[in-house]
Amino acid sequence: MGNLDWNLALELAEEHSVLGVVAARLKETGYGGIPADAWEKLQSSMRTQHLFSLSMTAELFRILDAFGQASIETLLVKGPIVSFLAYGDPAVRSYVDLDLLVRDAAILPACRILTALGFEADVPESAILAGKIPGEYLFKRAGAQQLVELHTEKTFRYYPRPMRIEDLYARKRRMPLEGRDVPALCLEDELVLNCIHGAKHFWERLMWPADIAAIVARHPEIAWERVRQAARDVGAEQMLHVGLMLGESLLGVAVPAEMAASANTDGAARELVRQVEGWLPTAGYVPPALLQRAMFRLKMGGGGLAGTSYLVRLSLSPTEEDWAEGKEERGSRVWEAIKRPFRLMRKYGQDG
């Protein structure tokens, strides 16, 4: 590694949100070969990441306590849970927010609790009362870098078919996190959710395939028939295959034997993997153009009628970005749906 440009390597790792993973692997080798200036830069970044993780964990416990007192069931997804599952440490994987899943019926009291805890709501209560569904219910703490996102079965619109939230709650488990057990999805459901989440973001950063590969490698106990059924229930078989194939092609983690037969015969998934490999080096800085995005969504949704239905629904389902300013509670949903494709054309219409 004598000719390696360490500053560039660390910069790329940061852009792909895998700096913590790189640091953990270098630690295993005793940081052999890394120059002093690069080592100091890496250690500084890791200290910052660990302090952030600790502050977010403390905030999480406050929220869970408040939700518990109000009898609001919630599940922690992504973020520190994925870091623990994939790397054995909630602080290894970088994340910017806490993601909590609650039932749609509980979203109003859950939002009010976060407001009472000092968070500022990005989605006004008037919009919730009007029945509008954002992409997520985002909360920010003024003067801090703490973000919380509430999700429901209705905001997870990137599921090809509706999320079966009661099934997820029925299979939930408690996981250790910094000395305390927290409510989480079962291992198989978390894996499927993260494949869907990676597909949502076009797998633009190495972080998402790395998570899938690490979870598969660390957990031989995964019940693959349960994974397959969970993906089938929500129409996400293609997304699951792509996630597993990316783990194999990019990280060298073989597609599990239990999944190999279906994955290896999935030509559409292999084509999608090649597409991802083409744009992955840019780490999302050169996003796919509009038509490329549309075709990717169509194929990721299963192709044919199912994929077309998935693409049309995503194209015509307004989020908070489509709501008219000051009319969050009154805007015509039909008009918002009509405007959405034009907004997407303006945002992604230019090639690259």
Give residue ranges: language-model regions.
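Conserved NTP-donor binding/palm subdomain of two-metal-ion nucleotidyltransferases/polymerases, i.e.
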Residues: M1-V96, V102-G352
